[in-house]
């Protein structure tokens, strides 16, 4: 079926006129273009020049979903299709304990948990397969059509038993605005001010930031929906399952949500890297019992963001005190702070039992942990700052006035550290009987 003369699997014969690529571009572990080789490649020599049929079939699906925008159209005045549909998403899926559970958790029998789907029609059941280049279609109204969307027209090339490359044209696409048939993406309002002004919100898929831990996205994925927040369809579906008394999804069962995506270069012209992350917590957090927990969790994540800013400011002031003006100092310190609290926060979130735990006690538990971790990181930063930072340096800074007036400020390590501890204690007040 991979090389059927009329209907090859996930391909169209008409794609033979498209842009030609080698097997190293098809191989998702390389995604290597002809004019830009990977420096540290997992394949070399003949291993880069060809793929087995099994490998090619797998990567065929990958390039269809995640292809970049480097291919040139063959026709004139054709619209831009952008990256492959999956590459445009902030992809998210629920994961069970085995393949069957994973399939069932992601098989949203109702669109967004409330709306019936249309009749399923995968691309291979069409009377006439789509073959025209860069074709705008209506938003699919059934999951089969969406899951088999041909973002690219593809045709494999082979020599004997080896796939040596492929030809590619732009395929089907539809506007991403309010494309709510897509159940496995995070959403965002790209212009909240305009939406508020006209009283109408437009949502688009929100790509994940590979530099940002998934738990930091918790408010936009799992919290209550509002004017500018819309939950992914698969999250709504699992919520519905959790609230159904006849559903076998036990409250205390741990459920995992995983995200993945591609990091593209300028204008999605090439793939820089791929990434993935996951988050585990009790299924009850998505049910009625968990509603009262989402706001406290969101608040703690917000406090983490502010603590990161305090750590970054401490690093910046320490660098000024030492006579250094490295612009990356603050960002590096914030990254280090998030790395420090990453696993502790995941474990705290996973430990929450909405049925038996008390909100205040769990919040206090995390705040004490976060305060200790931030304070220890700050102490280490001060120790590494050196003697010059303890003596300090005078630095000219702008006063913020209209005439760009400046004043001289003395930055020292003790002064910066005391200010940091003051802010930290305000953010995480020490509870009676607590330590640190």
Go through each PLM region and give its residues.
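The −1 position to Zn-ligating cysteines in a subset of zinc-ribbon hairpins
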Residues: 48-51, 153
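Extended alpha-helical scaffolding segments
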Residues: 1-35, 62-436
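Cys/His-coordinated zinc-binding microdomains
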Residues: 53-56
């Amino acid at each position: 079926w991979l090389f059927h003369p009329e209907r090859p699997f996930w391909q169209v014969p008409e794609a033979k006129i498209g842009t030609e690529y080698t097997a190293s571009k098809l191989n998702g572990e390389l995604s290597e273009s002809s004019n830009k080789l990977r420096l540290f490649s997992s394949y070399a020599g003949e291993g880069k020049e060809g793929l087995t049929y099994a490998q090619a079939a797998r990567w065929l699906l990958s390039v269809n979903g995640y292809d970049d925008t480097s291919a040139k159209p063959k026709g004139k005045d054709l619209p831009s299709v952008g990256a492959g549909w999956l590459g445009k998403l902030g992809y998210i899926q629920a994961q069970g304990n085995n393949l069957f559970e994973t399939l069932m958790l992601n098989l949203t029998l109702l669109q967004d948990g409330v709306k019936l789907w249309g009749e399923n029609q995968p691309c291979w059941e069409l009377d006439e397969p789509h073959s025209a280049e860069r074709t705008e279609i209506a938003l699919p109204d059934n999951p089969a059509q969406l899951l088999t969307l041909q973002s690219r027209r593809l045709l494999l090339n082979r020599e004997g038993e080896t796939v040596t490359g492929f030809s590619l044209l732009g395929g089907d696409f539809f506007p991403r605005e309010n494309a709510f048939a897509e159940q496995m993406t995070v959403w965002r309002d790209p212009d909240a001010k305009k939406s508020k002004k006209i009283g109408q919100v437009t949502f688009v898929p929100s790509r994940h930031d590979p530099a940002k831990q998934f738990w930091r996205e918790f408010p936009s994925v799992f919290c209550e929906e509002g004017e500018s927040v819309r939950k992914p369809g698969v999250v709504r579906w699992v919520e519905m399952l959790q609230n159904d008394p006849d559903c076998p999804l036990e409250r205390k069962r741990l459920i995992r949500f995983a995200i993945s995506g591609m990091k593209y270069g300028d204008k999605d012209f090439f793939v820089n890297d791929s990434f993935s992350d996951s988050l585990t917590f009790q299924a009850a957090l998505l049910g009625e019992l968990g509603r009262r927990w989402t706001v406290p969790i969101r608040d703690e994540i917000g406090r983490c963001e502010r603590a990161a800013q305090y750590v970054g400011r401490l690093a910046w002031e320490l660098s000024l005190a030492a006579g250094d003006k490295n612009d990356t100092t603050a960002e590096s310190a914030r990254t280090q702070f998030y790395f420090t609290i990453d696993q502790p926060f995941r474990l705290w979130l996973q430990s929450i039992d909405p049925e038996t735990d008390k909100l205040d006690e769990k919040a206090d538990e995390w705040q004490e942990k976060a305060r200790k971790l931030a304070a220890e990181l700050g102490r280490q930063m001060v120790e590494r700052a050196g003697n010059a930072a303890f003596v300090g340096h005078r630095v000219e800074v702008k006063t913020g006035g209209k005439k760009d007036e400046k004043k001289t400020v003395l930055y020292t390590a003790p002064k910066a550290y005391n200010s940091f501890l003051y802010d930290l204690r305000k953010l995480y007040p020490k509870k009676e009987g607590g330590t640190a």
